[in-house]
Amino acid sequence: MAVTQILVVFASALLLSMFFTGVDSTRSNETWHEHAVENPEEVAAMVDMSIRNSTARRRLGYFSCSTGNPIDDCWRCDRRWQSRRKHLANCAIGFGRNAIGGRDGRYYVVSDPNDDNPVNPKPGTLRHAVIQEEPLWIVFKRDMVITLKEELIMNSFKTIDGRGVNVHIANGACITIQFVTNIIIHGIHIHDCRPTGNAMVRSSPSHYGWRTMADGDGISIFGSSHIWIDHNSLSNCADGLIDAVMASTAITISNNYFTHHNEVMLLGHSDTYTRDKVMQVTIAYNHFGEGLIQRMPRCRHGYFHVVNNDYTHWEMYAIGGSASPTINSQGNRYLAPRNRFAKEVTKRDYAGQWQWRHWNWRSEGDLFLNGAFFTRSGSGLGASYARASSLAAKSSSLVGVITYNAGALNCRGGRRC
């Protein structure tokens, strides 16, 4: 593993946003900036400094087995991972690299898969765990399928860690990350999520309120920051698999396995919602697999680093956008479908060529197979992509190895994961 390609986070780095816990879903739009990274230029400067200054790096390869995947090399080769679970929080990369989840709190063991009462959840249930005000690292006592009656509304500073067991959130409502900060979701199967709502749901020990109908996303990120979604398997939900909207930022989506879905990932609320210009999202080391159609992702306004992903299936297109997002595609592998009318990786919406030719979309070091092609636009200069750069890309020839274990892992205690 090349040390110059390891993202550095300095212990003395300037805090990028203020952290708040337990913000109720009834808060007004004017509070959304509380969780935003307010200065994307500052983030870009820190990332650039991190990549160039390898002498002061954080050593993600502490237990390295040199897979080439810096996240996995950080923790997976440690046979004692089960007793050192919280080390995972030191392994994030990209724009969501400062997400610590429940690292500084106690462990909470989920022992009950039921979700009988979304207003008064029982201790031992996942819902009871995620609504608490304190930081928590949430683990599971055994294999379980959790069918949620209503959205699982998370409070700040939580980690959901499915390693060591087989946990499915399926066949009901799924996960909502709204007006909160510092969330890690790792090692969960999320599928067959359905619209729910028009019901009372608790969001903290001191608050519950009326929830209108939810779309049926696998993971919905709304007005939140410092989010890391890693090593999950997602498929077949009613709306998106992962949606991030309403000035959400400082997000990393990594090592996930996406299958059997139409509109995979939406990043940005609407063309008219300009607050999404603060959005910075890293999409790294994911496998976009069989049965996918479009939106991998579909972007608006912000800055998006798409790096070292494996795109083996799409039916319409892979990466789309509108409202002048900056898209930095580096070191990905794009395998086009057989359909000769669907070879293009990219798609621009709601703009003529005279408009989108100014949008900064670049491809650098990508591998194109079976006739795949990426339509570039805007500036080709590196400086134009500073705010859409979050880590050093590896060679696209390594993508198959880097993404080989994408999705929820089969980890067992006492063994390398």
Swiss-Prot record:
Q: List GO molecular-function terms, semicolon-separated.
A: metal ion binding; pectate lyase activity
Q: If you read the UniProt record, what top EC class would you report for this enzyme, in one word?
A: lyase
> Can you tell me which residues bind Ca(2+)?
215, 239, 243
The protein's recorded glycosylation sites are: 29, 53
List the EC numbers from the record. Answer: 4.2.2.2
Q: Which segment of the chain is annotated as a signal peptide?
A: 1-25
Pfam family example for this protein?
Pectate_lyase_4
Which InterPro entries does the entry mention?
A: AmbAllergen, Pec_lyase, Pectin_lyas_fold, Pectin_lyase_fold/virulence, PEL
| Cofactors | Ca(2+)
The active site lies at 295
Co-factor: note: Binds 1 Ca(2+) ion. Required for its activity.
* Record key words, sorted: Calcium, Glycoprotein, Lyase, Metal-binding, Signal
The name of this protein is Probable pectate lyase 20
Protein source organism: Arabidopsis thaliana
